[in-house]
Amino acid sequence: MNDNLNKVEKMIGHTPLVCIEYKYNNIIRYVFAKLEWFNLTGSIKDRSAFEIIKDAYKTGKLKESQPICEVTSGNMGISLCSIAKVTHNPVIICIPKTMSIERIKLLKSFGAKIELLDNFPQCFEKANEYEKQGAYLCKQFENKSNIKAQTKTAKEIAKKLDNVPTFVSGVGTGGTLIGIGRYLKKKYNTKIIAIDPKEAKLLTCGKSQGKHKIQGLSDEIIPKLYDKTIIDEIIEIASDDAICMAKKLCKDLGLNVGISSGANFLGCVLSGEQSCATVFADDNKKYLSTDLTNDEIKSDFIDNIELIKYSIV
């Protein structure tokens, strides 16, 4: 089992870091973004899923053939399914019906047992039932292995950049923002900015105020991993603006990013900072059935952002 995990580890991490040069309000600025779709299954969640499974085996909490269960908006589930194939663990996924059909079909293609439910609270309730029946519940919203995985991402960023003045990221489980943010703040005194879907206002209100379309962010609860003591600012991004920004990154630069990446990039723009680092958590292939391909979605101020070029750092 360990040998198989070691093989998988070689296909996770060490993703490209690009520097995107853009102009906003006639000022040239820069965003340094990790392209996380270069991971095993195409998302940043491969890092967390690997670390969670590895640590669970190491501590004896997970054994071969034992079912793995998780609540997910999609990417973590896909990552778990792939990695669990080499450890010979069946996977049970509890996912809201509102997630993209591509995510659900991908989960089915791995042979996962899927529980489609109305919302995240129902997903957590169902997952707890499976845990009582003997499944290993990953609990990515509170599992410190999630933080550990993204600390490695932070170290990859730090290896490429002499300084990181600002780091911007959305919050789903909190693993990415806190894992990367905490390390960078300690090393560089980096300003940490959290992205909150404008329709939900979860981080500012403590409870979701409405539905949004940025899958992977604001999953109806503030995760236990979220550490507000390291957060310097919260920026709200409207779903349609995030979608338009993701489309623009693809159309103008050829960077085929997912919706949350559009939100992260916009957060960098609206921060007013000269230089920001962020992550592009996945690509656009899981969102082709969503408004990401809807030409009627418009954003007035996105046109004021001129994407000039990108280079590999």
Model-assigned labels for residue ranges:
Residues M1-V313:
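PLP-dependent amino-acid enzyme catalytic core
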